Amino acid sequence: MAFKLWLLDEETIYEHVFERYTQLEGQSGKLAQDLGIQDRRGGVLEITFEPSGLEGGRKKKRVRRRNKASSVEEDQNVAVDSYHVSVGQSISSLHSSRDNGNSTTGYVLWSTTPFFINWLLYSTSAAPFRLGSQVEVTCGSSCEGHMLELPRLIDLTGADRGKRGILELGAGISGILPVILGNFVDTYVSTDQKGILNKLKDNIMENLSQLTRKRCISRSLRLELPTVEPVGDADITAASLPSKSTLHLEVAALDWEKINLQDKKTHSLHPELSLIGETCSSVYVIAMDVIYNEYLIDPFLKTLKQLKHWLQTTYNLQFHVLVGIHLRSQEVTTLFLEKAIIEYDLTVYDIVDQVIQESRFNFYLIT
């Protein structure tokens, strides 16, 4: 069964937060009681993503290979590819008071991101994000709701003619979202503060082999399509050869406290954002575990408002946001929802799904 959406408002914010943290308390014996670092023991993490619990007891051959994604039987409803990534992280930088202006949480991989990837690719309940479909919306405590049409976040088949993009905010150093989800979109822009970008680029390049469904071009990573040499007397061009579709993948600095898209002079400073507008018909902004203290909330929401207004008015894009939160402080979660809904007038939905509710995470759809 697909997930449902609960439309939150000024009254239901508090009901939602109370219920969600009550669920957490009831599961305290099953869930890890930590801050959410994926693994603080090592500098290099090896992580595998693969299908599990497929419906109907169907057995599918799985192949696990180092730095090589395996593709098996095609299925439109769930992803069937497996991925293995190596993530270089810096525990020392996490605890440094000098690195990146003392903003250091991005130097390690946080567990919200791997959970989101597994849920999005392999959970049957996440199908609306893979297929593009209507989702049931419940409004407040009423049993009567409506249906919301969602565009595909990712296209597993490659047959959809729509051009889709992902803009990642607060990417951190891991680079696993672009090298995995990049297989299923046309444009991917991964952003964070300037001090994070070199390690982010290193991890993307280390795991570029996981982009098995796409040819990747990137100005920021200096990746171009390979040239094709003539064979015999034939003048063969790249366009004449059977090939994969192309992914535009960029890494860019984006400071939430400094961005000002209302000033046309600053547009030239963010060509990667213009790339999304020029190449896509829909965009999802993805932000995983970026809301963990109260000081980040206003800059983050101001950035979302600017991006929404600019991409919709300038390029007429379908615009949606997915925010993943590791549920730590109840006060921070409440404040984020209050500000998003009341102060910034954003439409916020709680993604209601059993798999998510059995975890320490929560995901919100913002339109």
UniProtKB/Swiss-Prot annotation:
The keyword Methyltransferase applies. Its EC number is 2.1.1.-. Disulfide bonds: none annotated. Signal peptide: none annotated. S-adenosyl-L-methionine binds at W110, G170, A171, G172, D192, W256, M288. One of its GO terms (biological process) is methylation. Keywords: Methyltransferase, S-adenosyl-L-methionine, Transferase. Transmembrane segments: none annotated. It is an enzyme of class 2 (transferase). GO terms for molecular function: S-adenosylmethionine-dependent methyltransferase activity. InterPro entries: Methyltransf_16, SAM-dependent_MTases_sf. GO terms for cellular component: cytosol; protein-containing complex. Residues 58-68 have a biased composition (Basic residues). Residues 55-74 are annotated as: Disordered. Belongs to the class I-like SAM-binding methyltransferase superfamily. RKM5 family. S-adenosyl-L-methionine-dependent protein-lysine N-methyltransferase that monomethylates 60S ribosomal protein L1 (RPL1A and RPL1B) at 'Lys-46'. This is Ribosomal lysine N-methyltransferase 5. It comes from Saccharomyces cerevisiae (strain AWRI796) (Baker's yeast). The lineage of its organism: Eukaryota, Fungi, Dikarya, Ascomycota, Saccharomycotina.
